[in-house]
C-alpha cells in the first residue's frame, strides 16, 4: 500500500493570513518555475495551496487575483511565445477516497461512467512544447504561465529523447517533460563543481537551470518524455482530424512511432484500465517501483482515454477536467543541518553523519542523513545551519543532496573536520576520499569482534557487545583469534561468568570453528566485501589458501569484483595474513563445503576456471534468485543471510535487486516493490512454502 499524504491543508484563520499565504505561494511558485528552486518543498507548497483553496471555498467573494488556485503552474514566470493551445496544470488528489470523489464528479459532468482510463507516471520535470515543421524540430518553448512561454530553442540538441527530425515529415507539436535522470543529475553536479559552481539541489532544479542557461562554458545532457501530441497551424487537415479523435493511449503510440521518447520503454509505462479500482491498483504498482526508477516522479497522472470523454469534460481556466494528478508523498524535503557527527566503522573508516532538524518524509521522521565523506562535504559547500535538501526513497538511507543556497542568512558556520581519530585519538589517514584511522581495525576492536560474532558471520551465541567489552578490558582478547584461545579458568575469573555461562560460550566458540569459509571471510571484515561477496569469493576459491594465493587478475574472476576492487581485496587479505594464520592454528575451518578450487591458469595464459561450478546440478543451478518479505513455514527461522547461503548451496546466485535477468523471486509476507517489479517484468514468483519444496533436499 502507498502511504497517505501526511501534510494536511494549512489552517488560514482570517483575511490577513490568507493574503500572506497567497503572497508566499506566489513567491514560491515563481522561484520554482523560473529556476527550479523554492523556499518551500513540495509537501509544504501543497499544504499551503490546499489551505488557500479551503479558505476561498468559504469566502468566494474575497479571492485575490494572485491566488495560485486560478493560475496555471501556480503563477509561473511568463514568456513571450504564445501557445496555440493553453498548456494547463493538473488538479491533485492525495488518496483513494479523493480519487473516487473525482471520478464521480467526472461521470456526472459527462453524464456517463468513464470506461477507459490511461494511467502513467507524473514525471518531476519541466513541461515544454516542441514544435516540428515538416518533421524538423524548429522551436522549444517552456510552459510559462500556460498561455505563453519562454523560447529555449538554444537547448535543442542537448535533450535525449527529443529527436531533431521525426520519422515522418509532419507538422505537429509534441508536449512533454524535460528532466534529468539520476545518472545525468550526478554527472551535472560533477561538471558544475569542476567549473566552480554550487551543486544543484535536486534533479528538477538542475534541469530548470540547465534548460534556461544560454551562455554556459559547459553542457550537460537532459532527457525528454512526451505526453502530448497536437496539431499546429499548417498541419495536414487529415492528420489534424485524426489527432483530435485518437484515444490518448493511441496518441502516445503515434508519438513513439515518430521517434519521440515516452514512458513506454520504462518500468512504469502508461497503461489503460477500465475501472477506478484498477486505477488505484496501478497507482500502488507505480508507487512501489518509485525508489528503483532512474528518474524522479512525484505522482501518477490519470486521464480519460477516449477523445469523446475528454471533449465532453472540457477544461477549466487552470486545469483539464478529464485528467488528475494522484500525488505521492514527497521523497525530498527541505530542513536544517544542525550538526555533523563523526563515526568510526569497524575497519577504521571515519564517516560523517548529518544531524537534521526532524522532518517527515514518506511517513518516517528523519533526523540523520549520510554525508558520505569529507571530500563530499567540501564539494557540496555545506555549512552548519544550512537549509538542505534531504532525499529518501523507499528503504534507501536518507542523504543530503545540497544546500539551498538562496535561503542562507549569513549565520551559517563552517563544518570542522576532525584532526585526530574521534574514537582513539590516533592520526587520520587522509590519502583517500574516505578517511581512515591510522590504527585501522584496532581502533574499533570491540565493534569488529561483535560484528564477527554476529548471527550472519560466526554466530557465536552469548558473545554480544557487553561480553566483548569485558574480554577486551580484561586483556584476554586483542584480536579475533584470541577468542578461540580462551580457557575455562580465564572466563570463570570474570564477573558475571558462572560455570553455565562459561560452558555455553566455549561450546558456541567450538561450533564457530566449524563455520564455512564464507562466514569466516565475512567475519574478517575485508573492506569492499560483505556477506554476499564473501560467499562468492569462498565458493570460487574453495579454500583460504587459494584466496591468499590469488593476485588481482585472479580475484577479478569472481563475479562482482572488477578492476578497481580486486587490488584492494588482495591487499586486504595480505594485511590480514597473520590473523588468518592464528585462526587456522586455533582450529578455525578454512574451507567452503561443496566448493571446488579453480584449475590453475593454462600455460598459454588462459584464465583458470573451476573444475565444476559450485552447485552444478542443484535445484537452482544457473538461477538468479531474489528474496523479499518475511519468510514463513520451514524458512521462518532463517535469516536473510542464511536464505542467501541456501540459494547458493542449491546452485543459484542470490541477488538483492530484481531485473530482467532475475530467474525467481521468493516473495514472503509484506513483499512490496520487488514483488511488484517481478510481476511487471514477468519474473517467476514463489511463496516461501513453494521454495522450501524446491530446495527440500538441502534443508536441515
From Swiss-Prot:
One of its GO terms (cellular component) is cytosol. NAD(+) binds at residues 42-46, 89-90, 143, 177, 303, 327. Its cofactor is Mg(2+); Mn(2+). Its EC number is 6.5.1.2. Residues 590-621 are annotated as: Disordered. Residues 615-700 form the BRCT domain. The keyword Translocase does not apply. It is an enzyme of class 6 (ligase). Keywords: DNA damage, DNA repair, DNA replication, Ligase, Magnesium, Manganese, Metal-binding, NAD, Zinc. Zn(2+) binds at residues 421, 424, 437, 443. GO terms for biological process: DNA repair; DNA replication. It catalyses: NAD(+) + (deoxyribonucleotide)n-3'-hydroxyl + 5'-phospho-(deoxyribonucleotide)m = (deoxyribonucleotide)n+m + AMP + beta-nicotinamide D-nucleotide. The active site is at 122 (n6-amp-lysine intermediate). Pfam families: BRCT, DNA_ligase_aden, DNA_ligase_OB, HHH_2. GO terms for molecular function: DNA ligase (NAD+) activity; metal ion binding. DNA ligase that catalyzes the formation of phosphodiester linkages between 5'-phosphoryl and 3'-hydroxyl groups in double-stranded DNA using NAD as a coenzyme and as the energy source for the reaction. It is essential for DNA replication and repair of damaged DNA. Belongs to the NAD-dependent DNA ligase family. LigA subfamily. This is DNA ligase 2. It comes from Streptomyces coelicolor (strain ATCC BAA-471 / A3(2) / M145). The lineage of its organism: Bacteria, Bacillati, Actinomycetota, Actinomycetes, Kitasatosporales. The gene is ligA2.
